[in-house]
Amino acid sequence: METKELKEIAELSFGKNSSRMTKEEQENIYNVDSLRQDLNYLGEIKPSKQIGTPATFNEGDLALRLINPQAAVVSSTTAGSILSLNFAKIVPNRTKVDEWYLCYYLNEAEDIQKQIELSAQGQVSTIKRLGAKFLRELKIVLPDLEKQKELGQIYRNWLIYRHQTEEALV
């Protein structure tokens, strides 16, 4: 296993303030509901081979909420959404990292939580917001790619199971 900074295994883009967006852009903004929709998406996600603009999400990109961090792999349902100030777009280099493994690692790994806690030291607010520099330098532990794919698929199956269980209880 090796450890890499996020900037070494993925491209990162950051959104703009919604007050600087056109009305049309504001209507198609990626938000918390989009994130939930992607985390609960049951269909297959096929990473886009297109190179999109840094300001929009493609299927297979990761959306990372910067306030109280949470990540999701972007589905076809929310692909094309506009990147806002509250999210980062992460385009994984798929020769180095599996998107579902990276989603798992960002959401669940204790190591990430410790890095976030350390970065938040000295902040007055209890709301944690990730900065661009911190995010680029975030350390990610990488098993070999086959193991990443295996762990990523287990995480994806767990998300599907959790969503189906929640739906059954409603």
Predicted regions and their residues:
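Short, surface-exposed beta-edge/turn micro-motifs
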Residues: 27, 59-62, 85-87
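Short, structured beta-strand/loop micro-motifs enriched in basic residues and often containing a Trp
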Residues: 40-48
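Short, surface-exposed secondary-structure edge patches
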Residues: 51-56, 78-79
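A short beta-sheet element
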Residues: 67-108
